[in-house]
């Protein structure tokens, strides 16, 4: 998937670094469930017979990501929300589906939407979810990783030390060593700290996955034209559709 689905701007080393610290980031920044969600109202995608639950299980298995807590809110407007939440004193990635996806949608519609959003459960991408999809937050955390590796960042040390404590006090030693090793390789490869470009590439990857799962450009374009703009996204619906059209005629798509 990395070679033929992920965008070239999704730097391999940034991805690895964020993946190594994602569990600690998620634990640090997890929030209680919103009041309108009750744990007993979860939909179990392993046993629920509804189409949306079966499609969620299918997409989860195809992408090989962890199982999210799933809540269905058919009477409330909206598309999809992915929350970095806490349940039973542990991090529980939580996906909430609203009326735009639960009314009048078939398998192809659900395959696109679920594929597009469930790729965010991939640990490096989930790190960005935990950071509220803020490019500024992402930059601060990446510079914190550089600081921990004794690299110059140009940021105030006190601020970076505070972030470092929050993250690295939650990381096992093996993950710290992995992060340091990846950071060295990142620097040796002349990597760019333009993490905003990386964030945009992860968004593009989500749309590509959704398109591959539904295998219908018309359906993909229809959903993109109707979806609400996500926080942190710099792409217009036209940009997203153009990206998928170009991808659909690329060599990567046919491999």
Language model features: what each stretch is:
Residues 96, 109-117:
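Short alpha-helical catalytic segment bearing the HExxH-like zincin motif
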Residues 1-92, 99-108, 123-125, 132, ...:
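Hydrophobic or amphipathic, alpha-helical segments that drive membrane association/targeting
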């Amino acid at each position: 998937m990395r070679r033929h689905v992920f965008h070239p701007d999704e730097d391999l080393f940034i991805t690895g670094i964020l993946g190594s610290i994602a569990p600690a980031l998620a634990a640090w920044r997890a929030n209680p469930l919103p009041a309108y969600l009750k744990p007993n109202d979860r939909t179990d995608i392993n046993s629920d017979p509804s189409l949306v639950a079966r499609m969620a299980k299918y997409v989860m298995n195809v992408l090989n990501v962890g199982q999210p807590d799933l809540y269905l809110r058919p009477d409330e407007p909206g598309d999809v929300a992915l929350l970095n939440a806490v349940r039973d004193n542990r991090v529980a990635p939580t996906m909430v589906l609203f009326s735009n996806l639960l009314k009048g949608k078939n398998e192809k519609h659900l395959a696109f939407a679920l594929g597009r959003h469930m790729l965010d459960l991939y640990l490096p991408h989930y790190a960005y979810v935990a950071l509220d999809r803020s490019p500024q937050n992402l930059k601060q955390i990446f510079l914190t990783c550089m600081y921990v590796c004794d690299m110059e960042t140009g940021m105030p040390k006190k601020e970076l030390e505070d972030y470092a404590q929050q993250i690295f006090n939650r990381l096992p030693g093996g993950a710290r060593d992995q992060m340091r090793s990846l950071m060295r390789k990142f620097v040796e490869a002349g990597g760019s700290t333009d993490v905003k470009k990386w964030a945009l590439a992860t968004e593009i990857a989500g749309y590509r996955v959704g398109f591959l799962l539904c295998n219908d450009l018309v359906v993909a374009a229809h959903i993109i034209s109707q979806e609400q703009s996500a926080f942190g996204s710099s792409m217009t619906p036209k940009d997203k559709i153009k990206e998928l059209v170009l991808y659909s005629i690329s060599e990567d798509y046919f491999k």
